[in-house]
């Protein structure tokens, strides 16, 4: 996709493993991909949300892909006993979603406090960038 992205090489190394073991997206992640990658000004992007959506649809057709519904709430105190700052909410939400569905949350972000989510430490997977 974006060969100039800081983590492009790491993503290329990681994706074959994800394909073998299975990988997942949810509406939140899909929307973010189309919104960001589809911006006309995004360098090396497809130029429009429609084209980004077509590219996303191609990857979603892979047999290794699993769709996870956005079926948890930040108001569920059992899943979210404590919240970090506002910049961490989306990552914690995605981590809790992975816990609920018995999968893992793969990320390049080493700053996520995965211990805030019950089961989060086991579900957190940091993708190596070096």
Predicted feature residues:
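Amphipathic coiled-coil/heptad-repeat helices and related helical stalk/stem segments
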Residues: 11, 90-91
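Short, well-structured N-terminal submotif of metal-dependent ribonuclease cores
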Residues: 1-25, 37, 41-51, 120, ...
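Acidic catalytic patch
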Residues: 3, 27-31, 53-83
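Acidic, PIN/NYN-like endoribonuclease modules and their adjacent C-terminal/linker elements
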Residues: 72-84, 92-130
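Residue-level detector of structured alpha->beta connecting loops
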Residues: 19-22, 64, 102
């Amino acid at each position: 996709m974006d060969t100039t992205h800081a983590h492009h090489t790491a993503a290329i190394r990681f994706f074959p493993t994800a394909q073998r073991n299975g990988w997942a997206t949810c509406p939140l992640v899909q929307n973010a991909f189309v919104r960001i990658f589809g911006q006309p000004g995004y360098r090396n992007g497809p130029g429009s949300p429609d084209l980004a959506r077509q590219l996303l649809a191609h990857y979603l057709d892979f047999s290794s892909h699993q769709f996870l519904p956005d079926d948890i709430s930040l108001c569920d105190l059992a899943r979210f006993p404590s919240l970090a700052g506002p910049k961490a909410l989306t990552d914690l939400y995605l981590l809790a979603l992975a816990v609920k569905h018995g999968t893992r949350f793969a990320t390049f972000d080493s700053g996520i406090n995965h211990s805030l989510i019950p089961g989060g430490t086991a579900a957190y997977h940091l993708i190596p960038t070096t």
